[in-house]
């Protein structure tokens, strides 16, 4: 049996994805009832960060500790993948001392190359092309609040970025319709649209995408590494803010999500996080539970392989 990794959502079957989402909610209930569950005592998670993140570090480190294991944090100062030592060599050495690895970096090819030479499961904590761990949390959150997302309509408002790409994959796997509203020049990459055009519809304005949506999602206008484009992007995205008026075009029980951190007054209105249908705090917490379910799945799959 081949070693299992989680670099994109499609590294799972739809059945496996649904099982992980169900398990995430089970683990959440166990945590809330103070039940101690430590199946991975002695297991070590390596966390390689070339892009910093508060939520990613806390959720993974807390998760493996709650499982009875431990985590090692490697900052850009500690390891520079592909700079000084080939990624392939780093992967062989690092994975020989760990049980599972999470990488948060820039180029998606970095996690692919690392996984190709790793002896243990590798999780994509975020790359420029994909953010699959966030989709696990988003899907779990929607299901907990509204039930199945199959057949629903999701509106993505803003940049056709890594989050948007992962939503495109999720639409294909989970059977929902995805309406994407982006300014000209900021649409998702053509290769993602070409493969999943059957479940995606593009719009050049936020209002049309929001009509009758069951879920509205957005992200920052300028991601890490795009700071020099901030002013240009503010101008391009000015008409793509998620606010109370836009929510009024959606289905009455439409949920609102944002992966955080959010910039009030930019991609969202000053009060959007306090909207009655905003579930961003549950969404943020569910990073912990969804990633615990993912780690449990990958570690158990690796044990089967052994």
UniProtKB/Swiss-Prot annotation:
Entry GO terms, CC: cytoplasm
Reaction(s) catalysed by this chain's protein: carbamoyl phosphate + L-ornithine = L-citrulline + phosphate + H(+)
Keywords recorded for this protein, A-Z: Amino-acid biosynthesis, Arginine biosynthesis, Cytoplasm, Transferase
Database matches in InterPro entries: Asp/Orn_carbamoyltranf_P-bd, Asp/Orn_carbamoylTrfase, Asp/Orn_carbamoylTrfase_sf, Asp_carbamoyltransf_Asp/Orn-bd, Orn/put_carbamltrans, OTCase_ArgI
One GO term (biological process): arginine biosynthetic process via ornithine
The keyword Transferase belongs to this UniProt entry's keyword annotation: yes
Pathway membership: Amino-acid biosynthesis; L-arginine biosynthesis; L-arginine from L-ornithine and carbamoyl phosphate: step 1/3
Family that this chain belongs to: Belongs to the aspartate/ornithine carbamoyltransferase superfamily. OTCase family.
The protein's name in its UniProt record: Ornithine carbamoyltransferase
Organism listed in the record: Acinetobacter baumannii (strain ATCC 17978 / DSM 105126 / CIP 53.77 / LMG 1025 / NCDC KC755 / 5377)
Lineage of the species this protein comes from: Bacteria, Pseudomonadati, Pseudomonadota, Gammaproteobacteria, Moraxellales
């Amino acid at each position: 049996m081949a070693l299992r990794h989680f670099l994109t959502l499609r590294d799972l079957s739809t059945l496996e994805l649904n099982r992980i989402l169900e398990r995430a909610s089970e683990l959440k209930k166990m945590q809330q009832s103070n039940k101690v569950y430590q199946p991975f005592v002695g297991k070590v998670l390596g966390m390689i960060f070339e892009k910093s993140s508060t939520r990613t570090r806390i959720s993974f480190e807390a998760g493996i500790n709650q499982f009875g294991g431990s985590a090692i944090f490697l900052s850009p100062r500690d390891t520079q993948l592909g700079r000084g030592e080939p990624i392939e060599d780093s992967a062989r050495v690092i994975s020989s001392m760990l049980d599972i690895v999470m990488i948060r970096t820039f180029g998606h090819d970095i996690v692919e190359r690392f996984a190709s030479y790793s002896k243990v499961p590798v999780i994509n904590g975020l790359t420029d092309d994909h953010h699959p761990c966030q989709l696990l949390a988003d899907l779990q959150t929607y299901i907990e609040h509204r039930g199945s997302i199959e057949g629903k309509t999701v509106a993505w408002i803003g940049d056709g970025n890594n989050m948007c790409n992962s939503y495109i994959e999720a639409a294909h796997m989970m059977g929902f319709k995805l309406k994407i509203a982006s300014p000209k020049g900021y649409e998702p990459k053509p290769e993602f649209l070409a493969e999943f055009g059957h479940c995606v519809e593009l719009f050049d304005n936020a209002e049309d995408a929001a009509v009758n949506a069951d879920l509205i999602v957005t992200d920052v206008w300028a991601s890490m590494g795009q700071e020099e484009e901030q002013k240009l992007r503010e101008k391009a995205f000015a008409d793509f803010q998620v606010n109370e008026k836009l929510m009024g075009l959606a289905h009455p029980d439409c949920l609102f999500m944002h992966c955080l951190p959010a910039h009030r007054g930019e991609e969202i209105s000053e009060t959007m996080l306090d909207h009655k249908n905003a579930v961003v705090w549950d969404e943020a917490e569910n990073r912990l539970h969804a990633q615990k379910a993912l780690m449990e799945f990958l570690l158990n799959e690796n044990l089967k392989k052994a």
